[in-house]
Amino acid sequence: MTMTDASDLLSLSYSHYLARAAAARPALAERIAAWAAAPVTRAALDARLDELLAQGGQPPSEDALKKALRQLRGEAFGAVAERDLAGRADVAEVTGTMTDLAEAAIQRALALLAAELEAQYGEPRGPSGERLALGVVGMGKLGGRELNVSSDIDLIFVYEDDGETAGGARGPISVHEFFTRLGRRLIGVLSEATADGYVFRVDMRLRPNGDSGPLVCSLGMLEEYFYVQGREWERYAWIKGRLVTERASAAARRLAQQLDAIVKPFVYRRYLDFGVIGAIRSLHEQIRQEARRRATMRPDKADDIKLGRGGIREIEFSAQVFQLIRGGQDAGFRVQPTLAVLRHASASGLITEEVRAGLTHAYLFLRTLEHRLQYRNDAQTHAMPVDPAERAALAASLGFADYAALIDRLDQHRAFVEAQFDQVFADKADGGARREDDQAAGCIWSGALADDGADEALVARLAELGFADPAAVLARLQAVWRSSRYAGLPESSRVRFDRVAHRALEAAPGIDAAHRDETVVRCFDLLETVGRRGAYLALLTEYPAALRRVLSVLGATRWGGGYLIRHPQLLDELLDDEAIDSPFDWPAFKDALRRRLAAADGAEHQMDLLRHAHQAEVFRILLLDLAGRLSVEHVSDRLSELADAMLDVTIEVVWSQLAKRHRDTPCFAAIAYGKLGGKELGYASDLDLIFLYDDPDERAADVYTTFARRLITWLTTATGAGTLFDIDLRLRPNGEAGLLVTDLDAFRRYQLREGDAANTAWVWEHQALTRARYSAGDARIGAAFEAIRVQVLTTPRDAAVLAREIVEMREKVLAGHPNTTERFDLKHDRGGMVDIEFAVQYWVLLHAARHPEMIRNTGNIALLREVSRFGLMSEEEAETVGAAYRTYRKLQHRLRLDGMEKARVEPERVAAERQAVAALWARVFGA
């Protein structure tokens, strides 16, 4: 292409900057045309930089380096502009090329400048003599690979440790001094304005202590700064922090690994962190104030598509709030690009696909518009033009008929972004129509609680709110107000605590009178528990609906309230209606849990993740239960399925970490008995399990015993997140005297009584087998277990002998659960649940040989119907006894939710049910 063809390039006709550059450098137009034929890759940038540096002699001088980098920048800028204006490059290509340009410039400049300095002072070395490298952390859009075409670059310089250089033409200097000199020279090479322009403006203000801090900092200094002074806005900034220097050398790899270990816990909290909502809201308001101040000073810059309402920054904030809140628990949020964050938020159900698409389209439109504004004069501007000619050119470059059409589209996007931003960040804390201090709640939760002389007035106020025992409620409020926990809260947490306390008291009149006092007292128990974790107070402040649900749970169930107080991270579950309402999908649940475990930081974190995942699903089941959307049977089904899923994933993760493992997957299975086996699990039920293995390896017994011990530890150890399950292994062959894990063939012989008479199953063990099933682990062993179970249960038995042994076992159970009260124990007393279960087990063991349908583990009520079908009881009796069992289970379930350890009721409440069950027992066993 010749100069006469330069006008054919869209970039030269649109960009005043490129037109001037092409006039000063005739070969530029030809280079732009050649490069614009295809996307400009990192390899192309490196190759072109080699050519340009070779023109300046070897080794290239600093001046030659500056010239080459500036020429490369002009060519890349032109190629990107040409492809973009021609509609051949999308936003990702434009920002990717500019990011590659910045990284290539930084890495090449650093290598050449470091070599010069090392010739003078020697290589930088750490305390043990190891070579050290300067790490350049790209922040902001550089870190996110989202660099715009006229952006400055935000950098932070870090190095591994203090030390001294080895000495060269001059004597040694400190490592800190060496890297400071290197950093200063790098900044000069990139940002100094020469006759050829500049490469990138460099902004170092994000480093520790900003302009007043040292130019470079060691990792030790950075870690101390994060720990002592790190602020919320710096967490936000470091989300996009990324090393943009080379990663191949040993020094660079060490630095990257250590930097990640320091930054990750600073940015991503282990627990859900809702406190960042207020922090980002405050930061956004500061930015808006600065934007308004600039607009006042420069009215022509007032319409800012980056900092204005509905602009780029609001999209970035809307995405990154998810990272700060959830990135500690969900590694999928630890990504830099804004659109990748939105994709993960949508995949996680935190925003709808419609919202993700709307924000994505707005972001891409705004970034494209931003680039059009910047191509014009290579200016770092985000302001819409006021000059009519500039407006017309801008609209035409984007394919709009006129500027009004462009503004119409822009306003549509900005309105959508603004609405989504406000939905997340609008300050809901002060939304009441009246001042809290003027309300009854404000008068109660106040300094008056510290004044004994105010008790009478406070009791009267509490009575106005409808409390049955206002004096007792006052005593609890005073205890909290005067406690060291409350007094020691940081100011921001105390303000939030007070707001939630006011709201809880204001809500009292709307709470069921029978539970009002207890509900509010439990709420303050919860507030005391979460007070030290400002994030949970922030959640309750930011989301009033969450507090309403908390009060609903606390009022409806004592057990559920205690569960929430023990596991306050479950507060987050109250925000997600979609997750609560979504169908239970256990394969998807396990896959998501596996991904989170794979990204976890060690075994302790994995154990916490398992507990959090289990607790969240238990709580979801509880919320559906309290809403009347699950029957007692369905609650038990879901809890049992959840336990199976947790066991399956835990078996996998524990095996993967077992040093002794001799195969990729264990030939090992967990077999469920009791409530888990019968799918009648309650919220706080133990898991009755046995462990089987089937592995010919000579080390198998030792390996699986070690594995089982480790598995039990993972399931039962109390971590900061609580325990996963209580496990009962006494139903294994020979009970507590037996082996922890049992070989499958040995289990078969034990159950079929083929071995030593002293080592065979008792009748009660065969009773237990009627409710047993495969739960988790190797499905092949599960199928083999079921075959053994069928063989055992279909073995012919003597009716009289079987009846006698079952009656004797029933007496032992009764003796083991004495009831000295006048209330009826729904499970263990005569006429209760155990009588029904033993009768069903008797029929299964006696008649399964003739009626194999009876061995199906379908639950006691379904088995009663099977028994009636075979003529062993009438349909009427089956319905009556089945209804009694269902009534007992509902009552037991309700009492457990109310926090009762033993499920006992007034005898007259279940008189008819007891009579029906007693009649059944007498008919079957004659006793």
UniProtKB/Swiss-Prot annotation:
CDD domains: NT_GlnE_GlnD_like. Its cofactor is Mg(2+). The keyword Cytoplasm does not apply. GO terms for cellular component: cytosol. HAMAP family: GlnE (MF_00802). Belongs to the GlnE family. InterPro entries: GlnE, GlnE_rpt_dom, NT_sf, PII_UdlTrfase/GS_AdlTrfase. Its EC number is 2.7.7.89, 2.7.7.42. It comes from Burkholderia pseudomallei (strain K96243). It comes from the Bacteria. NCBIfam families: PRK11072.1. GO terms for molecular function: [glutamate-ammonia-ligase] adenylyltransferase activity; [glutamine synthetase]-adenylyl-L-tyrosine phosphorylase activity; ATP binding; magnesium ion binding. One of its GO terms (biological process) is regulation of glutamine family amino acid metabolic process. Residues 438-927 are annotated as: Adenylyl transferase. This is Bifunctional glutamine synthetase adenylyltransferase/adenylyl-removing enzyme. Involved in the regulation of glutamine synthetase GlnA, a key enzyme in the process to assimilate ammonia. When cellular nitrogen levels are high, the C-terminal adenylyl transferase (AT) inactivates GlnA by covalent transfer of an adenylyl group from ATP to specific tyrosine residue of GlnA, thus reducing its activity. Conversely, when nitrogen levels are low, the N-terminal adenylyl removase (AR) activates GlnA by removing the adenylyl group by phosphorolysis, increasing its activity. It holds the Pfam family GlnD_UR_UTase. Keywords: ATP-binding, Magnesium, Multifunctional enzyme, Nucleotide-binding, Nucleotidyltransferase, Transferase. The lineage of its organism: Bacteria, Pseudomonadati, Pseudomonadota, Betaproteobacteria, Burkholderiales. SUPFAM superfamilies: Nucleotidyltransferase, Nucleotidyltransferase substrate binding subunit/domain. It catalyses: [glutamine synthetase]-O(4)-(5'-adenylyl)-L-tyrosine + phosphate = [glutamine synthetase]-L-tyrosine + ADP; [glutamine synthetase]-L-tyrosine + ATP = [glutamine synthetase]-O(4)-(5'-adenylyl)-L-tyrosine + diphosphate. Residues 1-428 are annotated as: Adenylyl removase. The keyword Nucleotidyltransferase applies.
